[in-house]
Amino acid sequence: LQRYAAGILADEGFTLTTTPDLARNEILSGIGYQPRGPETQIYSIENTELSLVGTAEITLGGMYAEQTLDAEQLPIKLAGISHCFRTEAGAAGKATRGIYRVHQFTKVEMFAFTEGDAENKASSAMLEDLLRIECKLFDGLGIPYRVIDTPIGDLGGPAYRKYDLEAWMPGRGDGGAWGEVTSTSNCTDYQARRLGIRFKRKGEKGTTFVHTLNGTAVAMSRALIAVLENYQQADGSVVVPEALRGWVGKDRISPR
């Protein structure tokens, strides 16, 4: 699944990166996460100003902290392959059991820097492109899904607009249910202001804050649920999606 996602992102013009598992708390705060507190989703390292990352968004966004980019460099599209660590504070109930919510998983994350403008033209176009790529990934896997345009009241602090992809998971709930597998957000200049990331247009005075966007390509645990539950057969075997057969080396996984 990682190689499948990474291959598509490389073809889409993303620079592939392997990101660290630790980040400075000032970067977490700049991205919009709270590294301390009773309801935090972050694992902090005692007696340090470091925390385990919950997503590569944190380290990818922090790559250009306190820098001024040239407009000609934009957009910058990065893909991070990382471990993700989350406390999952407050998670409970049957729907969260198994590997749907876990404390550590691997994820391929998209992150983009675009020019900032009052109409959000560049970042809005990029958001639609990130959504297109997420749909392309799950179309390629043959997984049924739906797109949710997140209501304003459900947006977190950093996000100006956010889409979720929910995949059909036959084993979820009593008779199957939709489960979130990706999300993509346009944070406009929220993160850039806090991290001090600007850009300069040639021939113009002054600088402007960039806009930042993030999006899940594939979160391994949840994508695996969707693949296994949609492709499992009556005899217990699992048909391997055609897009993955080159890496799996077979077209069906049989029970032992």
Q: Can you name each region flagged by the protein language model?
A:
Residues 2-256:
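TRNA-recognition modules of translation machinery and tRNA-sensing kinases, especially anticodon-binding
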